[in-house]
């Protein structure tokens, strides 16, 4: 699911950061799980049909999520929900979201008065 780009990126970055800091494979798995749980259910509602608003700012949240999850895992904190079950839940949540929130530009922020009137600048 394309709308999971931010969560998927955080889920890959968190264990990579743990690895770079000398963490164990178990810590890496828990970092991945915690990063995914923090962003589970994030919708894709691009204003104007582009990934500029609000996606660029959401990428910052994803980066901080990865850093936070890595730090927690390195500190010995583990996900209470097993990592493989977290990923299964991510897929289920993605399938459960209505089509209007699946990168169609028809729901969420894209459906606000501003979102419907927004015309991206050609450049």
Specify the residue positions occupied by each region the protein language model found:
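Functionally critical mobile loop/hinge segments
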Residues: 6, 10-123
């Amino acid at each position: 699911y394309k709308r999971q780009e931010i969560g998927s990126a955080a889920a890959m970055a968190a264990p990579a950061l743990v690895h770079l800091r000398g963490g164990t494979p178990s810590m890496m798995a828990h970092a991945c799980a915690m990063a995914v749980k923090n962003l589970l259910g994030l919708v894709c509602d691009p204003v104007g049909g582009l990934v500029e608003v609000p996606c660029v700012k959401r990428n910052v949240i994803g980066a901080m999520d990865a850093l936070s999850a890595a730090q927690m895992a390195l500190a010995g904190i583990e996900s209470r929900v097993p990592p493989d079950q977290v990923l299964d839940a991510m897929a289920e949540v993605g399938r459960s979201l209505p089509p209007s929130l699946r990168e169609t530009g028809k729901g969420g922020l894209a459906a606000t008065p501003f979102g419907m009137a927004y015309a991206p600048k050609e450049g």
